[in-house]
Structure formats: structure tokens, C-alpha cells
């Protein structure tokens, strides 16, 4: 199937609402600790009061951060990136790269189970939207123009992420390259 240069959405997965899902959990050092079945969060009335206006707009209303504008988009500090809404671990600094776009970009998620994708035809474009698998928060978009080894670029809104640095003692032992 010709995808017009975009990721084939026939493999995109959006979990059904109001069901339990299986996600991969991670230690504070970013190491997988096992799969866990948890309930999806499809509606949480406290999101508007718990999130900043920008994070709410991005995650719940599918807005986009302005490029180069949100603190942390270009951080090189070792750590993990969690969903700002529900805390699900999504990405690692080890897969982060500078795409020059002004948004955090990753070659892959930490665990495929923790994200969902679906076709996005908004604004007259054909894209693949990236969402948190647990709470359906809009994270950003997936493009087929990333570096090796995946060739993918997960272009993610910084306002949708909560960065958690690795513990200082684990950075020296496990994360030096």
C-alpha cells in the first residue's frame, strides 16, 4: 500500500476505551520490571485542574507546543519521560536525538505496549498520531524520517511529558557510553 512517504497506518493500534491494557513498567533507572495489566483511564475530570493550561491543551485537546519554546525540549540529561497525565513511562533519553525541529524527538518508545497510534487527517495532512496507551493523551506524531536504527522520528510535545532524571548513582554505572 502506498503511504505517500508516511508510516503505514494499517499497523496503527488504538486500544478500545474502558478496558484494561497491559503496559511495561520500569524502575527509576529505566530498566523494565515487567508487564502489568491496568485499567485504562478514559476520563478524569481532574486533568484540567492538575495540568498546566498548555499541558491540558496539548494532551486533552490535541494542540501542539510552539517549536523551541518549552523548557526541556533540548535537554540531554539522562532519564525517562512519562505521560504528564497518568505517569506511564513512554520514552528514554537513550532514544532521544536532536531533530532540529524544536520538539523532543525519539527513535523509539521504551515499550511499544505503552503507546498507541492512529491515523490523523487533521489540518489537511496525513500523519500518525502518538498517544499514551493508558489515558489516550495526545503526545505528538510519528514520522518516517528519523535516524538509524529505526528510521522513525517520534516528534513529541514537551508539555505532554514529565521528565524524571535517572538517580545520580545509576547514571555513572549504567548510562555511560
Question: Which residues does each PLM region occupy?
Answer:
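N-terminal pre-domain segments of enzymes
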Residues: 4-45, 172
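A short Gly-Trp-Pro
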Residues: 26-28, 39-44, 48-82, 88-177
Amino acid at each position: 500500500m502506498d503511504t505517500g512517504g508516511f508510516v503505514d497506518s494499517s499497523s496503527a493500534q488504538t486500544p478500545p476505551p474502558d478496558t484494561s491494557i497491559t503496559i511495561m513498567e520500569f524502575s527509576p533507572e529505566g530498566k523494565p520490571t515487567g508487564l502489568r495489566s491496568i485499567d485504562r483511564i478514559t476520563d478524569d475530570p481532574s486533568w484540567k485542574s492538575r495540568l498546566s493550561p498548555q499541558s491540558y491543551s496539548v494532551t486533552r485537546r490535541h494542540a501542539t507546543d510552539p517549536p523551541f519554546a518549552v523548557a526541556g525540549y533540548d535537554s540531554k540529561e539522562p532519564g525517562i519521560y512519562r505521560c504528564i497525565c497518568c505517569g506511564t513511562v513512554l520514552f528514554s533519553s537513550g532514544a532521544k536525538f536532536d531533530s532540529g525541529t524544536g520538539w523532543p524527538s525519539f527513535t523509539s518508545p521504551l515499550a511499544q505496549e505503552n503507546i498507541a497510534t492512529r491515523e490523523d487527517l487533521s489540518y489537511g495532512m496525513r500523519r500518525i498520531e502518538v498517544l499514551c496507551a493508558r489515558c489516550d493523551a495526545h503526545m505528538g506524531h510519528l514520522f518516517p524520517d528519523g535516524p538509524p536504527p529505526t528510521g522513525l522520528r517520534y516528534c513529541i510535545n514537551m508539555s505532554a511529558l514529565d521528565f524524571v532524571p535517572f538517580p545520580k548513582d545509576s547514571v555513572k554505572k549504567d548510562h555511560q557510553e
